[in-house]
Design a protein with these regions (language model features):
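C-terminal non-catalytic regions of proteins with extracellular/luminal or membrane-system context
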Residues: 1-236
Length: 236
């Protein structure tokens, strides 16, 4: 079997549908959806270090959803693309890659990359963009991401296992504007989910974990009904 087809099949059979009320999924064909969360573009495919993989050319969650006929609300899409690109340019400008070999030899690479790093804050979406999106669609999709832990940098409870303050704020804003909300968990470990009960608008909840190179494509197929999710949690 082709490597990409195998990767997609594994991802499809691993994604767990934790909640689906009022037949929220599959999404209606060509329905416009308000996408939120930095991980829709900064999609997490694999771990780091020895758990890392070559994911060059892999589609993001946003891209693969578009490929499957889901229409992202354009103003929000533009906002997130701008913020992500701005962040990438800043990081590239500030890092001197000519120093890498020197850093490895000195041991400072461990000091930089071998320590715990908290999840990145969610972007603060302007209220006007949320209002405008809510006028066009009643459905939103939020992607929550986690990519930390291992080798003396195990995850923390505050703002890691539990939601960050910026994630809490985003959820509150989205659930106060949209009747139907889908939450996708693109996380490398369990997180607290008690907050789901606080928001009746969260109709669907999907755990995709760190799904590999074809994970975003597999998720898009599930959201549109092309594939039925068949994954199970290890503890249930």
């Amino acid at each position: 079997m082709d490597r990409k087809l195998l990767a997609r099949r594994i991802a499809e059979e691993s994604i767990v549908l934790l909640k689906n009320e009022d037949h929220m999924l599959p999404l209606k064909e060509k329905k416009e959806i308000a996408f939120f969360g930095r991980t829709q573009i900064g999609t997490l495919y694999s771990g780091n270090g020895s758990g890392g993989a070559n994911v060059a050319g892999c589609g993001t969650i946003l891209e693969e959803c578009e490929n499957c006929g889901i229409r992202p609300e354009p103003l929000l899409k533009g906002f997130y693309e701008y913020k992500i690109n701005e962040e990438r340019v800043t990081e590239e400008d500030e890092f001197d890659w000519t120093k890498v070999s020197e850093m490895v030899n000195s041991g400072i690479m461990y000091e930089i990359f071998g320590k715990y790093r908290a999840p990145l804050d969610e972007y603060e979406v302007p209220g006007t963009l949320i209002d405008q999106a809510a006028e066009k669609t009643d459905t939103a999709l939020i992607v929550i991401g986690r990519n930390s832990g291992g080798e003396e940098c195990d995850r923390h409870l505050s703002e890691d296992y539990y939601l960050t303050n910026s994630e809490e704020s985003l959820l509150k804003e989205v659930c106060s504007h949209f009747t139907n909300v889908v939450v996708v968990l693109n996380v490398n470990g369990l997180i607290d989910l008690s907050w789901v009960r606080k928001y009746a608008n969260i109709k669907s909840l999907l755990f995709i974990g760190i799904p590999g190179e074809e994970g975003a494509s597999a998720l898009a197929g599930i959201l549109t009904g092309e594939t039925n999710p068949s994954g199970k949690l290890a503890v249930t």
